[in-house]
């Protein structure tokens, strides 16, 4: 109860301050609605869609963005059909959870300036293990995958633990899986936000 009151009070105060702040002018028409992320969750791999992102930037109002997203959702569901959508969900869940590196180097501009190791000493040693053209990047991927499989096996073999705490963590993971199936996903990096639940379950 204390946690709920504290969280609710904090949210109300922060929300009030944001709505009444004068430092930054906020253009509400540029807000991206939540349904947009459900829409791109239905793209080819269920991940980021440049086409839909561009539409969000070009449409003039929030309602226009919502209408566009609804139309695209209906179009994509109709195109797949029931069996096609079920198959898509299985494939998307595999993409969401299978990669132990959490999609390291698969996307993102932050690494484009450092794909080739150029450092010295310990810095170079790290770069060889994590950069795209590092000599040991394959070793990193292999070890990360082994670690991930072991973590999942520990969780799976711990099914006999039926305490409230364990069940709460399992429900949190199920909720995370469902969230990523409904919204933007398609790669394991989206699973990072749920890592605390995996690690806690694996350690029990």
Per-region residue spans from a language model:
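Hydrophobic alpha-helical membrane-interfacial segments at the cytosolic entry of transmembrane helices
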Residues: 2-17
């Amino acid at each position: 109860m204390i946690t709920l009151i504290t969280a609710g009070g904090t949210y109300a105060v922060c929300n009030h301050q944001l709505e009444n702040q004068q430092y930054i002018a906020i253009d509400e028409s540029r807000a991206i609605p939540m349904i947009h992320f459900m829409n791109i969750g239905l793209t080819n791999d269920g991940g980021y869609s440049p086409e839909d992102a561009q539409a969000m930037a070009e449409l003039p109002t929030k309602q226009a963005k919502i209408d566009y997203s609804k139309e695209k959702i209906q179009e994509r569901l109709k195109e797949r059909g029931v069996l096609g959508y079920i198959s898509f969900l299985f494939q998307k869940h595999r993409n969401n959870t299978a990669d132990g590196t959490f999609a390291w180097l698969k996307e993102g501009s932050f690494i484009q300036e450092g794909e080739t190791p150029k450092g010295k000493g310990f810095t170079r040693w790290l770069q060889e293990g994590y950069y795209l053209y590092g000599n040991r990047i394959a070793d990193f991927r292999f070890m990360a995958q082994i670690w991930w499989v072991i973590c999942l096996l520990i969780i799976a073999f711990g099914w006999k633990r039926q305490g409230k705490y364990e069940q709460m963590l399992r429900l949190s993971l199920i909720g995370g899986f469902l969230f990523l199936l409904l919204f933007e996903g398609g790669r394991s990096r989206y699973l990072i936000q749920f890592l605390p639940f995996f690690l806690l379950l694996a350690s029990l």
